[in-house]
A protein has these predicted regions:
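Outer-membrane beta-barrel transmembrane domain signature
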Residues: 63-65, 137-140, 144-229, 233-239, ...
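Cleavable N-terminal export/targeting peptides
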Residues: 1-29
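Outer-membrane beta-barrel domain signature
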Residues: 41-48, 72-76, 110-111, 115-122, ...
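Short glycine/proline- and aromatic-enriched beta-strand/turn motifs that initiate or cap beta-hairpins
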Residues: 23-75
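Surface-exposed loop and membrane-interface regions of Gram-negative outer-membrane beta-barrel proteins
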Residues: 66-90, 95-119
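Hydrophobic, well-structured mid-protein blocks that either form specific transmembrane helices
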Residues: 106-162
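Residues that define the transmembrane beta-barrel architecture of outer-membrane proteins
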Residues: 26-30, 49-53, 79-83, 90, ...
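Transmembrane beta-strands of outer-membrane beta-barrel proteins
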Residues: 31-37, 56-58, 69-73, 88, ...
């Protein structure tokens, strides 16, 4: 136990040192983020219920408008594993992104062993397209529309894509105060549901799948900055609730 504690302490000091150096660099075309979470929540879903490390490596232009990257997550026990590709663009309040998401967790009920299999009826991937806008000025409401356009979103009969859609709205209640506080709500439905059901990627029927409240703060340790967030998430359709705590250990 003492050995594990020493290793964890050494790793923490190393990450702090690397991040401090990285935060002093400017205008580099490569970005990286390492995040530690008590669990991984996404769009109303509890993707991982164990301590999770998430990493994001991307290339960007000098204005950081375009991004092309890979995102990965892994649970501490190895049960949860994910590897994604993405491309995104943002300008002022407008954002658009395309994600190829591949969760190959150990207990998955779909194809979790063929990363290069993109056959519509067999693949474990799904491709999600999101478009969003954040209003500028005194009313910074954010709205987004996300639709799964390909992959494991084909319903119980596996005949054709359901085009499951997730519509989200969020608003910052507090900004640049002692803490930042944001509230959000989302609904999900299928654009092409199977006969006799409104089941979609996110729930067994159409409805509200995510109500959340997120508090975030940047902690200062000398020249090192540690962003911390706590998100309470309620899923009315799933009849569950969770709290996610996240630490951005390393960012450059």
């Amino acid at each position: 136990m003492k050995s594990k504690t020493r290793i964890l302490f050494t790793l923490t000091i190393l990450l702090f040192s690397i991040s401090l150096a990285a935060q002093q660099e400017k205008n580099i075309p490569i970005g990286f983020n390492l995040q530690l979470k008590n669990m991984h929540l996404w769009r109303g879903l509890q993707v991982s219920n164990e301590v999770t490390l998430a990493s994001d490596l991307y290339f960007t232009d000098k204005n950081q408008a375009f991004k092309l990257g890979i995102w990965g997550g892994a649970g501490i026990s190895g049960k949860y594993k994910e590897f994604d590709y993405y491309a995104s663009y943002q300008h002022k309040g407008f954002q658009i992104s395309v994600w190829d998401i591949y969760n190959f967790s150990k207990d998955a009920t779909y194809n979790n062993s063929e990363v290069f299999n993109y056959k519509a009826h067999e693949t474990g991937h799904f491709v999600d397209v999101s478009v969003g806008y954040t209003f500028q000025g005194k009313f910074p409401l954010s709205l987004s529309w996300s639709t799964v356009i390909f992959g494991r979103d084909r319903g119980a009969n596996n005949k054709e894509n359901l085009y499951s859609t997730y519509v989200y709205a969020s608003y910052p209640i507090l900004k640049d105060k002692f803490i930042d506080l944001e509230v959000g709500i989302a609904g999900a439905f299928a654009l092409n549901p199977e006969d006799g059901t409104s089941a979609n990627f996110y729930a067994s029927s159409a409805g509200i799948v995510n109500i959340n409240l997120t508090a975030s703060k940047k902690l200062e340790f000398g020249k090192y900055t540690l962003p911390v967030s706590v998100m309470g998430m309620w899923n009315p359709k799933g009849n569950n609730a969770n709290i996610q705590i996240a630490l951005d250990l390393l960012t450059f």
